[in-house]
Each structure stands twice: as structure tokens, then as C-alpha cells.
Swiss-Prot record:
Coiled coil: none annotated. It is found in: Nucleus. It comes from Mus musculus. Its main location: nucleus. Residues 147-162 have a biased composition (Pro residues). Disulfide bonds: none annotated. Residues 125-146, 181-193 have a biased composition (Low complexity). This is Zinc finger protein 385C. Residues 109-224, 258-295, 311-340 are annotated as: Disordered. The gene is Znf385c.
Amino acid sequence: MLLGPASGSPSPLLASLTLPARPLQPPLDLKHLLAFHLNGTTPLSLFPNFSTMDPVQKAVISHTFGVPSPLKKKLFISCNICHLRFNSANQAEAHYKGHRHARKLKAVEAAKSKQRPRNPTTNGTVVSSASPPASGSPGTPQSKGPASPPLGPSLQLPPTPDPSAGDPVHSAGDPVHSELCDAAASSSSSSCPPCSPDPSREAPGPEPAEGAVGSGVNGEGRGEKGRLYCPTCKVTVNSASQLQAHNTGAKHRWMVEGHQGAPRRGRGRPVSRGGTGHKTKRVIGNRGGRQGPSPPFHCALCQLHVNSETQLKQHMSSRRHKDRLAGKPPKSSSQHNKLQKHTALAVSVLKSKLALQKQLTKTLAARFLPGPLPTTAAAICALPGPLTLRPAATAAATLFPAPVLGPALFRSPAGAVRPAAGPILFAPY
């Protein structure tokens, strides 16, 4: 160890020695170790080559290091007409192109068209007849005569055609059209001379009349559609033939008579729809059927209505009708009465069987095995070696008395039951 005076300057010997210098350790900082910035908010700032990465790596990195995006509300696509909700636009598009949506849409449009107020037919006729002549077509040639002053808005009507032409539309005599023509003639007589019939203006005359006829037909069709409904039965039909068939049917007559529900159709049961009157209504209501009431097939004695003469003959030859003629009371052929009879018979049979069983058990219990059981076992053990059934007077008398079981049942057979064997010793336990 070298000792020297303590001085501020280093000694030359120490300066000549090469000592390893200790590196200064700054505080540990992750920012110097990592190749990316920690303060970045997007994966692009963390990874410089993010744009050149594989799409799968991009998705993983953006899912791991990316900023969580705010939750987006899921958009629901729904159909208000069919009351359905879809998960995607493809499902919605397929539904809108389908038959179900088209049918619902047609039904809604039909209901809306029925709810719209209908204009009166007279106003439609006046407008349709007055509008075409007012707006003259540019292609029609004008007459060469002097131009007459224009008529008022209420007087701009097509001139009446020549009666020799025989127009079927105007020969019908529309009252509104005739009144307007009279008013036009009376008012224009003082203001302008009567105009000569112009062929260019006569041409569009029948068209508005035809339009008026068409609108009248449409109005009648709508009214007829509104009438295809039976308020009594609350039934709507599609055509007049269906409505007529419904009015002649049994259900409609049943509801008209004031009954509730549908008529019962029972075979052989009395029907409360009436006799002669019912048949008369049915024949009159039929289209092109026989006129006059048909003969009623009715048995007054049995209060029964049938449909044909053959059924009436079969009823007359039946036992039910003959019993009524003989004065016998009617037999109730209901299933309830039959079941009651069967159950009563079965109960009586069971009661008799139970009584017999009780009596037999009492008799056997009183007469069977009168002595104690050890005495009977000792008597059996006292029998000889071969097991042969021999009549024993005392045993037979004690075990089976004469009135119940006679000794003839216990006769010994001709030979032994089995070959001779050694003696058997009965040892309980």
C-alpha cells in the first residue's frame, strides 16, 4: 500500500496506473430500452412498420394495444307492416322481395282504399262531361265561320248531336245533362246566335259520356262490393252468386229464425227448423228449381222429420214406429242409460260373489283343522315307511268331517305312489 502526503493533485505513480473506470448507472428508464413510445394512443405509433404487416397481425395488434372504441348502438331493421325485426340488411331485402310482405302490403292498401270517402256519382258525371270540351286539343281544326264569344264556365258544354245520328248514350236521357243543355240554350239565346253544328266539336262529344258511364259502372261495382256482406250471420263473400248461395243455405235460415250457433244435423232426430214452411222456403229460394212446396216427409206419431220418401218408408217399417202404434212407451236408447244398466248388473253380481265367498270362508274356518297342529304332525309321523295314502279313521274324522269332504276322496291307489324308500323323519328347524 502506497502512502503519501495528502494533496489535492494526484500523484504521478497513481496517474500512471490504468484502473478500470466504473460506469455511472443512471436510473432505470423503460423508454430507453423500448423501441417504441409508451405514450402512443394508436398501434401506428407503437409499431413503425404497422402498415406493412399481415392483416391478421394488424387485427391482433389493434385489438391488444388499440384504444377501445365506444360501443356502437346496434341498428335494428324492422318491417312495420309484417311486424318483423331483422339482423342484417340482406335479411330485410329478402323479406321485402318475398310473397309474404307483398300479400300484407296489398291487404293494407285494400283496407286504405275502402276507408277513403267516395265522391257522389252526379258530381263525377258533371265534371267528366264538362271538362273535355273546355280544354280543346291543339290538333283539332277550328271552324271557318265567325268566332262566337266564349261561354261561361257553367255553359261550356258540347253541342247536342244530331237526333238522326241515333247516339245510344244521349238517347237514354240523362236528367242532369238535359237540364244543363236547357240552361245553356236559354242563356245564350240573348247573347249569341245559335251556332251551326261543327263536326270538329262533335267528335269529342261521346267520349265524356262514355267516361261518365264508366264512372257510373265503377260506382255500381264498389256499391256491389259493399253489399256482399250478410249482417245477420256476419259473413263476407266475394261474389253475388256466393251471397245468393249463402242466403239460401241452412245456416242463414237458422240465424234468421233467431237461433244461436250452427244447426245440428242429426240422423233420425227431430230437427226444430220447421216442417212445411222450411221446405217451402228452400224450394222458393233455390235458383231455377221447382215451384211450389214439396210434400213433407213427417211422421206425426213419432214427431220425426226425414229427407225423402224412402227414409219415411223405412221409418214406418221400423220397430220404433210399430211400438208407438201399439202404445208402448218409447225406449230410451241413450248410451247413459245403457251404461247405468250394465253397471247395476255388474255391481249386483259382485255383491253376490262376495257374499258367497264370505259364507264359504266362515264355514271352512269353523270346520277345518279343529285340533292343534302338533297333534296332526305327530299323526303324520306315525305313518309306516312307504308313503302310501291309507284311510285312517281318526285322522279322517278329525281333519275332514263327513259333511264337507267325504272319505271317498282319500282312497288309497292300487299301487305305491313312488318306489319304496327309507323312512322320512320330519324335523322342524
